[in-house]
Amino acid sequence: MTAQVLDGKATAGQIKEELAQRVARLRERDVVPGLGTVLVGDDPGSRSYVAGKHRDCEQVGLASIRRELPADASQEELERVIDELNEDPRCTGYIVQLPLPEYMDTNSVLERIDPAKDADGLHPTNLGRLVLNVSEPMTSPLPCTPHGIVELLTRHGVELAGREVLVIGRGVTVGRPMGLLLTRREINATVTLAHTGTRNLPELLGRADVVVAAAGRPHMVTAEQVKPGAVLLDVGVSRVPDPETGKGRLTGDIDPAAAEVASWMSPNPGGVGPMTRAMLLVNVVESCERQVFGQP
């Protein structure tokens, strides 16, 4: 058996085409959704990631609002920028690029974001709404990576209702909110949350129908551990030495050999990453639509 590919790039492209049509309808009403980004410092990786978000904006017709601060900016300076974006009607959603300098209080910064403009879907208010709302349509931004994973599976016809899903990793961006989304009644999966301290991980992997690996441990999930026919989503990112070049290269949490056992598997890179960026755009557009049309 060779796993079919959960193609995040192609699926994200489809979502962008759909978003472009929705943005066009908003523009007919003289409304242009806008994505804001706040970047502190000049980290090359962060700068590249932010630039990618603005290229995405251009593809679907969103306005780009960029705010950049020097690496030695104070927390007060950053908070003033956040307050400005909260009040700016051109900005319908924005993100503060992480990580921030160590001397800044990241949680305080993120909590200052207007929940309605929380493009990452990670504001405590929005996560709390996800906890409380099991059955009704969500009317607040969803966490981008978990939402992207569900959308990727749904668009490939992978059934989740009643299936055993193992989530490995307890981070706030993926692991913790993943189960909240999967156990909503409209999805109805049965979820186990594991992490690097889980003692019986091989046993859990052996019975999981779907595995979401987001622990940041290179190849911690092996082909021998995976249930035949399982669906595998590799979210983890680690840098390891390349034996051929001696340089660092990025790798995921799932050994590529597991593709010979799985029924579906997301590539890494090219699987979940593009979906995360697409869901960021979805949050921005939907925030604008809620303002204009009053729809969930």
UniProtKB/Swiss-Prot annotation:
Organism: Kocuria rhizophila (strain ATCC 9341 / DSM 348 / NBRC 103217 / DC2201)
The keyword Oxidoreductase is assigned to this record: yes
Subunit record text: Homodimer.
Catalytic activity: (6R)-5,10-methylene-5,6,7,8-tetrahydrofolate + NADP(+) = (6R)-5,10-methenyltetrahydrofolate + NADPH; (6R)-5,10-methenyltetrahydrofolate + H2O = (6R)-10-formyltetrahydrofolate + H(+)
Family: Belongs to the tetrahydrofolate dehydrogenase/cyclohydrolase family.
Function of the protein: Catalyzes the oxidation of 5,10-methylenetetrahydrofolate to 5,10-methenyltetrahydrofolate and then the hydrolysis of 5,10-methenyltetrahydrofolate to 10-formyltetrahydrofolate.
Keyword annotations from UniProtKB, A to Z: Amino-acid biosynthesis, Histidine biosynthesis, Hydrolase, Methionine biosynthesis, Multifunctional enzyme, NADP, One-carbon metabolism, Oxidoreductase, Purine biosynthesis
Protein name from the UniProt record: Bifunctional protein FolD
Enzyme Commission number(s) of this protein: 1.5.1.5, 3.5.4.9
Sites where the protein binds NADP(+): 169-171, 196, 237
GO cellular component: cytosol
Biological processes annotated in GO: L-histidine biosynthetic process; methionine biosynthetic process; purine nucleotide biosynthetic process; tetrahydrofolate interconversion
GO molecular function, one term: methenyltetrahydrofolate cyclohydrolase activity
Pathway this chain belongs to: One-carbon metabolism; tetrahydrofolate interconversion
Matches recorded under Pfam families: THF_DHG_CYH, THF_DHG_CYH_C
